[in-house]
Amino acid sequence: MKILEGKLAAPEAKIAVVVARFNHFINDSLVDGAVDALKRVGEVKDENITLVKVPGAYELPLAVRRLADTQKFDAIVALGTVIRGGTAHFEYVAGEASSGLGNVSLNADIPVAFGVLTTENIEQAIERAGTKAGNKGAEAAMVALEMVNLLNQIKAA
């Protein structure tokens, strides 16, 4: 039986990390986790990592699509934080960011790793940005690395 399974090391991969500036005090930790995972676990060279900053999570899909369209990247990691407030704004932003990034991934033919926190409160966001619940930026980066390798294996199979 042939089993295809992605590995985490991707030393030659070119990865874009796109991050929302809104809630930067959380997102900066997500970026730190993602870049650390790319370099330490994935063995990605510093010069092969591009960091792109957008105003907020709603703008992530457009920037990710444009980066994918350049065909210069093997994967893109999208990072941001949307915290529920007292209005319906949370549902719109979180839903559009999620849906938009999923559409880009399917249409661009490269992995788009979803590292957007959608939390009820700031405490949950902090926990997921490197404290109690790990670092979701690092997790998204590892998803991107694994998918780069897996898609290469599928192509070669």
From Swiss-Prot:
An example Gene Ontology CC term for this record: riboflavin synthase complex
InterPro entries, per database record: LS, LS/RS, LS/RS_sf
GO BP terms, alphabetized: riboflavin biosynthetic process
Class of this enzyme: transferase
CDD domains: Lumazine_synthase-I
Binding site for (2S)-2-hydroxy-3-oxobutyl phosphate: G86, T87, R128
The protein's Enzyme Commission number: 2.5.1.78
GO molecular-function term, one example from the UniProt record: 6,7-dimethyl-8-ribityllumazine synthase activity
Annotated protein name in UniProt: 6,7-dimethyl-8-ribityllumazine synthase
Keyword Transport attributed: no
Domain of life: Bacteria
Membership in a protein family: Belongs to the DMRL synthase family.
Assembly and binders: Forms an icosahedral capsid composed of 60 subunits, arranged as a dodecamer of pentamers.
Keyword Aminoacyl-tRNA synthetase: no
Pathway assigned in UniProt: Cofactor biosynthesis; riboflavin biosynthesis; riboflavin from 2-hydroxy-3-oxobutyl phosphate and 5-amino-6-(D-ribitylamino)uracil: step 1/2
Gene that encodes the chain: ribH
Provenance organism: Actinobacillus succinogenes (strain ATCC 55618 / DSM 22257 / CCUG 43843 / 130Z)
Function: Catalyzes the formation of 6,7-dimethyl-8-ribityllumazine by condensation of 5-amino-6-(D-ribitylamino)uracil with 3,4-dihydroxy-2-butanone 4-phosphate. This is the penultimate step in the biosynthesis of riboflavin.
Reaction equations catalysed: (2S)-2-hydroxy-3-oxobutyl phosphate + 5-amino-6-(D-ribitylamino)uracil = 6,7-dimethyl-8-(1-D-ribityl)lumazine + phosphate + 2 H2O + H(+)
Catalytic residues in the record: H89 (proton donor)
UniProt keyword annotations, A-Z: Riboflavin biosynthesis, Transferase
UniProt binding sites for 5-amino-6-(D-ribitylamino)uracil: F22, A57, Y58, E59, T81, V82, I83, F114
